[in-house]
Curated annotation (Swiss-Prot):
Family assignment from sequence similarity: Belongs to the membrane fusion protein (MFP) (TC 8.A.1) family.
Lipidation (S-diacylglycerol cysteine): 25
InterPro entries given in the database record: CusB-like_dom_1 (IPR043602), CusB_D23 (IPR032317), MFP_Efflux (IPR051160), RND_pump_MFP (IPR006143)
GO molecular function, one term: transmembrane transporter activity
Main location: membrane
One GO CC term on file: plasma membrane
Protein name, UniProt field: Membrane fusion protein MtrC
Lipidation (N-palmitoyl cysteine): 25
Keywords: Cell inner membrane, Cell membrane, Lipoprotein, Membrane, Palmitate, Signal
PANTHER family: ACRA/E-RELATED COMPONENT OF DRUG EFFLUX TRANSPORTER, MULTIDRUG EFFLUX PUMP SUBUNIT ACRA-RELATED
Name of the gene encoding the protein in the UniProt record: mtrC
Length: 412
């Protein structure tokens, strides 16, 4: 950024301004003794300032994470046979129930016809048993046949009824196997590379994965964090300091090249157990993937609001001189400039979040320090500074901006 490139110049200008502010009284006395008219004093230069007020700001942590599909399904064959045709395009989106492979179905078609023939035979046997029983019933009443013969006819009918039910079940089983010869998608999602080609022989019960389908909208992102930080996060949630409008913690995603994913995600849950070997807890968030930008397995940086800082101040980056001790220049009540040591917590777009060193209503100098230092003016004229369009549009996605931050008075 530009303010880093001119850091040495800013430091020199700040030192000059401080020295002039400290020596202005002595120089003014010397000028009076030399007979210099008061009207010859240099006019007060205009400096750009921002009047700061305390706010409640969520400090964001950046954690490593990995993207994971919402659902993943491996496609396998449930019946054996030779693959005759692949019915999908690799890498395409498929819907649940869509045909993916066709296995040679001739054997299963024959099995279904055989089961139907068995049903016809069983039904014919049942019809004969019904007719025999109908003839035997009046005969046994007249003692024309023995009771044993009648009981045998009853048993034959029941056996024929069971044979019909078995044949019906065989038809159903043969139909299931025939349907399974056409392998369909178990879930909707993007299907990857086919692991088999036409002509491959599959055996019944084979565990070979034919292809994998991944459901990628929304996507999961898994993050690990120390147990102590997660406990702190839970306290913040319990106090209501980090809840978003929908009652969930918002998370952002940043890629390796530094770009930030435009969609915000939401924290779903924290694993209830701590990894004994690392002392870490796994957190899971969900994020929309309507444009299919996110890919399963991709490593990302997760931006997550972790701590709500009360009485924090949002200060433009160019107003802060970074060093062993971070400082800003303040316009005091007498109209002069004075340095103030501050504590910078973290970056927020083109601003710094300052957690100590400032007070409500302080006028922090953003522009004009160099001019004031060169002119040797004892006083300056503060003017509210407005950022340029580029600076106003720069706050980082996934991090709360100053305009979104809640004033500390409202947070309480």
């Amino acid at each position: 950024m530009a303010f880093y490139a001119s850091k040495a110049m800013r430091a020199a200008a700040l030192a000059a301004a401080v020295a002039l502010a400290l020596s202005s009284c002595g120089k003014g006395g010397d000028a009076a003794q030399g007979g210099q008219p008061a009207g010859r004093e240099a006019p007060a230069p205009v400096v750009g300032v921002v009047t700061v007020h305390p706010q409640t700001v969520a400090l964001t942590v950046e954690l490593p994470g990995r993207l994971e599909s919402l659902r993943t399904a491996d496609v396998r064959a449930q019946v054996g046979g030779i693959i005759q045709k692949r019915l999908f395009q690799e890498g395409s989106y498929v819907r649940a129930g869509q045909p993916l492979y066709q296995i040679d179905s001739s054997t299963y078609e024959a099995g279904l016809e055989s089961a139907r023939a068995q049903l016809a035979t069983a039904q014919a046997t049942l019809a004969k048993a019904d007719a025999d029983l109908a003839r035997y019933k009046p005969l046994v009443s007249a003692d024309a046949i023995s009771k044993q013969e009648y009981d045998a006819a009853v048993t034959a009918k029941r056996s024929a009824e069971a044979s019909v039910k078995a044949a019906q079940a065989a038809i159903k089983s043969a139909g299931i196997n025939l349907n399974r010869s056409r392998i369909t998608a178990p879930i909707s999602g993007f299907i990857g590379q086919s692991k088999v080609s036409e002509g491959t022989l599959l055996n019944a019960g084979d565990t070979t994965v034919l292809a994998t389908i991944r459901q990628t909208n929304p996507m999961y992102v898994n993050v690990t964090q120390s147990a102590s930080e997660v406990m702190k996060l839970r306290r913040q949630i319990a106090e209501g300091k980090l809840l978003a409008a929908d009652g969930a913690i918002a998370v952002g995603i940043k890629f390796d090249d530094g770009t930030v994913y435009p969609e915000k995600g939401r924290l779903l849950f924290a694993d209830p157990t701590v990894d004994e070997s690392t002392g870490q807890i796994t957190l899971r968030a969900a994020v929309s993937n309507d444009q299919n930008i996110l890919m399963p397995g991709l490593y990302v940086r997760v931006l997550m609001d972790q701590v709500a800082a009360d009485n924090a101040f949002i200060v433009p980056q160019q107003a802060v001189t970074r060093g062993a001790k971070d400082t800003v220049m303040i316009v005091n009540a007498q109209g002069g400039m004075e340095p103030r040591e501050v504590t910078v917590a973290q970056q927020q777009g083109t601003n710094w979040i300052v957690t100590s060193g400032l007070k409500d209503g302080d006028k922090v100098v953003v522009e004009g320090i160099s001019i004031a230092g060169m002119t040797g003016a004892k006083k300056v004229t503060p003017k509210e500074w407005a950022p340029s369009e580029n600076q106003a549009a720069a706050p980082q996605a996934g991090v709360q901006t100053a305009s979104e931050a809640k004033p500390a008075s409202e947070a309480k």
